[in-house]
């Protein structure tokens, strides 16, 4: 995702024919595809590690939203899908959970992040009304990580919410009709100390109101 965006930025600089044009990228399909066909043709099983990858993929689209106009996740049901079915049951595969989480709770106005952490992929965004900020962190390491939150001159209310997708086993997966091994967990949190702990192999989305 990043490589395609970087290549198109290079084309814009080097090709005179593009100097006066704003041609953006419409990515026709993106997803993982591997493994046995458990849910029919191309009906592969997705694991928690794939959910982490999907979240990081979304992060790259957010960072490059100036040049990506559209990106279509492939697919929806069974065929490399984020929803899996049997004859009588259906349920979210691991990869469907970050798609659902970000769609429901992540902001739409990107915010610049000026720091980097080993094993952590971080993005932030404001909601359309600019009254809330969301911060998303993906921890690809086995160990828990802790970071400090610095919102600069922006005043943040001391209480917030978080949504967490976590499993200590990156190979964990969900089965339709059974209790999910991977799910979205919501909790109220305090931001008074501006410290945040992220479990290993986790996707964490934080929401805070701006005063």
Where are these regions (language model features)?
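Carbohydrate-binding surface patches
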Residues: 119-156, 162, 202-207
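Generic recognition of flexible, low-complexity loop/linker segments
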Residues: 11-15, 57-61, 120-124, 136, ...
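Extended catalytic-interface subdomain
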Residues: 1-15, 24-28, 32, 57
């Amino acid at each position: 995702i990043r490589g395609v965006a970087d290549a198109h930025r290079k084309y814009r600089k080097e090709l005179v024919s593009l100097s006066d044009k704003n041609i953006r990228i419409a990515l026709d399909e993106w997803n993982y595809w591997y493994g046995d066909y458990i849910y029919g043709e191309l009906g592969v099983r997705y694991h928690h590690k794939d959910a982490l990858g999907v979240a990081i993929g979304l992060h790259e689209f957010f960072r490059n939203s100036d040049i990506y106009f559209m990106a279509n996740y492939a697919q929806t049901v069974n065929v490399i899908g984020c929803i899996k079915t049997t004859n009588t049951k259906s349920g979210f595969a691991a990869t469907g959970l970050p798609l659902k989480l970000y769609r429901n709770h992540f902001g739409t106005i990107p915010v610049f992040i000026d720091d980097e952490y080993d094993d952590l992929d971080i993005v932030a965004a404001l909601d359309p009304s600019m009254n809330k900020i969301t911060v998303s962190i993906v921890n690809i390491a086995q160990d828990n990580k802790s970071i400090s939150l610095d919102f600069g001159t922006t005043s943040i209310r001391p209480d917030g919410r978080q949504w967490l997708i976590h499993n200590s086993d990156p190979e964990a997966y969900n089965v339709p009709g059974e209790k999910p091994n991977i799910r979205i967990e919501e909790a109220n949190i305090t931001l008074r100390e501006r410290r945040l702990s992220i479990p290993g192999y986790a996707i964490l989305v934080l929401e805070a109101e701006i005063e």
